[in-house]
Amino acid sequence: MFYKNSQAVKFSIPGGTNGLIFPSSPKGDQTMAVVEMDGVYPETGYSLNDFCTETIYLLEGSLLAEVGGQEYNLTPGDLLVILPGNRYRITGRGKSVDLITPAWDKAQNHILS
């Protein structure tokens, strides 16, 4: 499979998160995104996925991730895996490649206060 950059859809999330999300694989088993962040996600509270795993590979910058009550300082080359059912919050400035498995489904993501 091959996707051109022009096939990706731009997105913006309040709090300073922007990026490109590529089409999900035909089998629906994964979605890939390139994410640039300068702020906090989510803007308030925490995010939680019911069934998607988010794998974040940091390309540049630095991020502080709070996942399931643990804190992780990410620097370029670090990989963070956020399993379903873990509330999380990410702050900082950086650029990452994010792999979401199975394919992204916004309905399974919740913002908790």
Language-model features and meaning:
Residues 1-31, 43-46, 112-113:
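A short, N-terminal "cap"/entry segment at the start of jelly-roll beta-barrel domains
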Residues 8-9, 26, 37-38, 78-81:
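A short, sequence-level motif marking secondary-structure junctions
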Residues 2-3, 28-31, 40, 91-113:
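Double-stranded beta-helix
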Residues 51, 58, 75, 83, ...:
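A short, compositionally biased micro-patch
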Residues 28-33, 54, 61, 84:
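A generic structural signal for short beta-strands and their flanking turns/coil linkers
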Residues 65-66, 82, 87-93, 98:
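Short beta-strand His + acidic residue motifs that chelate non-heme Fe in jelly-roll/DSBH
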Residues 36, 48-65:
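Short, conserved beta-strand element in jelly-roll/cupin
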Residues 69-85:
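Short acidic-glycine-tyrosine-enriched beta hairpin
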